[in-house]
Structure formats: C-alpha cells, structure tokens
Amino acid sequence: MIRLRFAPSPTGLLHVGGARTALFNWLYAKKHNGKFIIRIEDTDTERSTKEYETKILSALEWLGLNWDEGPDIGGGVGPYRQSERLHIYQDIAQKLINEKLAYYAVYDGENEIHRSFEYPKKFKDKSIVVKFKVVKEDKTNFHDLLKGEMSFENKFFNDFIIIKSNGFPTYNFAVVVDDHFMKISHVFRGEDHLSNTPKQIMIYNALGWKNPTFMHIPLILGNDKTPLSKRHGGTSVDFFKESGILNNALLNYLAILGWHVDEEIFNVKKKIHTFDYRNISNKSVVFDYKKLEWLNGQHMRNLDIEELIIKFKEFLKLKNYNLNIDETLEYTKDVIIICREKVNTLSQLFEISFSFFTEEYNYEENYIKKFLKKKETGDILRKAIESFEKLENYEISSIENTLRKIVEDMNLATKKVFQTIRGALLGKLVTPGLFESIEVLGKEKTLKRLKKTLDIWEKYEV
C-alpha cells in the first residue's frame, strides 16, 4: 500500500517549505488511494514544545491537508511521536551492537576515548553514545524519483552517532526505524535532506530492511537565491494566515512552486487526479510574495460571496478586530462585493470595508490636510447634501449624474469634488468606486455622513 508521511519537528511554526512538502506527500497519497501520516519528530528535547506541535497540526488542518494517522488520532503503527518510541530505537540499536554493526563510544568532552561492543560501565561519568559502523569499502546507491540514480562512496563518511548520550536517537537513525515500522513506501522531502540519505540507506542495508522510494524536492528560495528564511519576510503558514491569505490560495501557490500544471489558478483538491511527480521541477524556485498576494485576490473574487464573508469573519475573529458584520444582510454582501474588487487580502478587505460598517470611522490625515481644511469643502458638502436630499432613485446612473451636476454647477475640478465627498462618506481617499459606494450606503447613511463631516468642517478655522 502507498503510505507517505510528513514528519515535522515541533521547534517552530510550520514553514511554507514544509507545507509544500506536506502538500506533495498528501497529493501523491490521495491520488493513489494511499495513506498520509503525520509523525512528530520531537527528539530535540531542548527546542521541541507541545505548543509548536499544536500549532503545526492546526496549520495543516487549516490548509485542508487531512491525515489518516497521527499523534492526535492514532493509528495501527503508533505511537506517532518519536519521544514515545524510545524503547523501539534502543532495541534496534542493541540489535546492531549485537551484530557488531554498531558500538558504544565514550567521549571526554569532544574526544573519543573508548570503543566497545559491551556497555562501558566503568565510564558512567562520561558521555556514552552508540555509533554506527560505516563499511568504508562499500558504495551506497539509491534511486531518486527526481534526480535519478545516486551513488556515494562510503569512504567519505565517518562512523556516526545513532543514539545520543541522553538515550534519544539521532535524526538519521530514528527516521529509518520509524519509516520501516510505519511501513512508509515513499519519502518525499526537501533536497536539504539529500546528504542524510546515504547514512540512512546504510542503516537500512545493515538491518536487512527495504528502503522506501525517495524523492528530494528542490528548496524554495528568497529573492536573493538563498533558502527562504525570516530575513526575506514572513515564512510560516501562520504568518500568511494572519496576513489575510486564504487557505486555498496558499495551497494553490505552493502547488505551482515547482509543480508544472496546465493552469495557474485552481482548487488543489480538484487537481489530485492530475498530480504527477514527473511534473515537479528539479530546479529551486523563488518565493514571490507579490505573486501570492495577486493569486489570493483572484481566489477572493472567485469565491461565492457568502463563503468569502464566512472566511472574512473567521479572519476578524483571528485578529481580534472589532467589526460586527451580519452575513445575513444584503448590505453586508453589497459592501463586500464592491470592496473585494479593490483588494487582494482579507487584511486589505478589513481596511477598505471598515468605514462601511461603523459610524465611528476616523478621517485619515491625508484627507484632513488636502480637503477637510479647505474653504471650498463646506460649499461642496452643502451642495451634495442638497442634491442627494432631492434624489429619489439611488442607482448608479442617477448617482453619477447627480455628482457630475454638482461639478458643473460649482465649476470645480471633478477630482476635488469627488474626493471631498469620498472622504466625507468613508474617511479615506482610497475606496471602492464612489458611485458604487454611495449606492451601497443608501440615502440615509449618505446624508448622515455628509452632515457629520460638514459639522466637523465648521469647527475648523478656514
């Protein structure tokens, strides 16, 4: 049976590179009716935390990468945390020692002072580890689905530690033991693990176990062509979630980062049947923040308005933004429809829509300086109030005609009149279309806001 795993270390938030690796594992498992397993590699006792484990699982869940077995739901080959599998590693290490394929090594500081196949009791006060014995005369070969046949000469490898002095396994030993007993058929991971693979193959061979099929995926880079890291900007799934990126948009972007597919904008779950590892690029790709934001905007505009409002409310709750919107009201739908055309993220949607949902909006400094403190602003607002009080039909064409009549009657620049009214209604100069905004606000809100702004203008000494 096809079985793939994603095995994060709970030492930080889920990196988008890790999320892409999880996605490719998930896609392959789903396409072949296999199993996708989550395993927590928490043998770094100093840095691993339960909090990060929870956040990693939450990020995967938010992305929609559901798993079939894992630390939270169990399964037939658990436990699914390495810290709960120490006895298994100890048993296998002892098997290697018994067969003289590994040995105890004693260290005094950084110096190895003793080796033996028997536990060195007389060195209890020293650091005692278990090291794997490399057969220097051999070569280690394996097939990589992306890179083809790989061959490494063992003479370039030193004996390496498999059990640390604290009794915990090293990474290279633990993953071999876990992947074997968890019956993992394929290991898809970043190419930064390629140098680890020969050591792991040596352990498989020593134990007489069949190794899984490997695929090492090129890394995601920053714009300076170095591995994507915090110095390039936010890199975690949580960062993008809190920035207002939709889960489906992030999945979509991660999928096209290296996977050649016949279209750019799509729902990843509808593409499961088309996934083919042979269409994954063997070259590293650069993470483009602007491209992701653009792609997110496309997803926002393609969503049913009801679904977008639900996601928007989830985002407001996540950020603790105080904006009470009722998704059942047509007014809410109308606001979101005109606002989403101007933005690419939920964060931007909050900024541009805020003034529609509250009368307690503030005027941005730019509007106050350029318009609110100008002498002619009072005349423009009075004329607008007079004109809109007379207007019966609050449709776009009538609203546009009314505004252009104000410009004509006052013999002022269109921009001056329109921006004065725009800022009066919404407190800012960048908004959805003015005609559309007035139509959505309706007569009552429009007049109330114009009068409020006029009252404020009168308090300025102009």
From Swiss-Prot:
- The organism's superkingdom is given as Bacteria
- Keyword Lipid biosynthesis among record annotations: no
Q: Which UniProt keyword terms apply here?
A: Aminoacyl-tRNA synthetase, ATP-binding, Cytoplasm, Ligase, Nucleotide-binding, Protein biosynthesis
Catalytically driven reaction(s): tRNA(Glu) + L-glutamate + ATP = L-glutamyl-tRNA(Glu) + AMP + diphosphate
Record's subcellular location = Cytoplasm
One Pfam family here: Anticodon_2
What GO MF annotations does this protein's record show? ATP binding; glutamate-tRNA ligase activity; tRNA binding; zinc ion binding
The record, for InterPro entries, names: aa-tRNA-synth_I_cd-bd (IPR045462), aa-tRNA-synth_I_codon-bd_sub2 (IPR020751), aa-tRNA-synth_I_CS (IPR001412), aa_tRNA-synth_I_cd-bd_sf (IPR008925), Glu-tRNA-ligase_bac/mito (IPR004527), Glu-tRNA-synth_I_codon-bd_sub1 (IPR020752), Glu/Gln-tRNA-synth (IPR000924), Glu/Gln-tRNA-synth_Ib_cat-dom (IPR020058)
Matching SUPFAM superfamilies, A to Z?
An anticodon-binding domain of class I aminoacyl-tRNA synthetases (SSF48163), Nucleotidylyl transferase (SSF52374)
Entry's Gene Ontology BP terms: glutamyl-tRNA aminoacylation
Q: Where is it found, in Gene Ontology cellular component terms?
A: cytosol
Class in the EC hierarchy, top level: ligase
EC number of this enzyme: 6.1.1.17
Q: Please give the family membership noted in the entry.
A: Belongs to the class-I aminoacyl-tRNA synthetase family. Glutamate--tRNA ligase type 1 subfamily.
Q: Which PANTHER family match?
A: GLUTAMATE--TRNA LIGASE (PTHR43311), GLUTAMATE--TRNA LIGASE, MITOCHONDRIAL-RELATED (PTHR43311:SF2)
Q: HAMAP family per the record? A: Glu_tRNA_synth_type1
Record text on subunit structure and interactions: Monomer.
Q: What biological function has been recorded for the protein in this entry?
A: Catalyzes the attachment of glutamate to tRNA(Glu) in a two-step reaction: glutamate is first activated by ATP to form Glu-AMP and then transferred to the acceptor end of tRNA(Glu).
Q: List the protein's name.
A: Glutamate--tRNA ligase 2
Q: Could you tell me which species this protein originates from? A: Thermosipho melanesiensis (strain DSM 12029 / CIP 104789 / BI429)
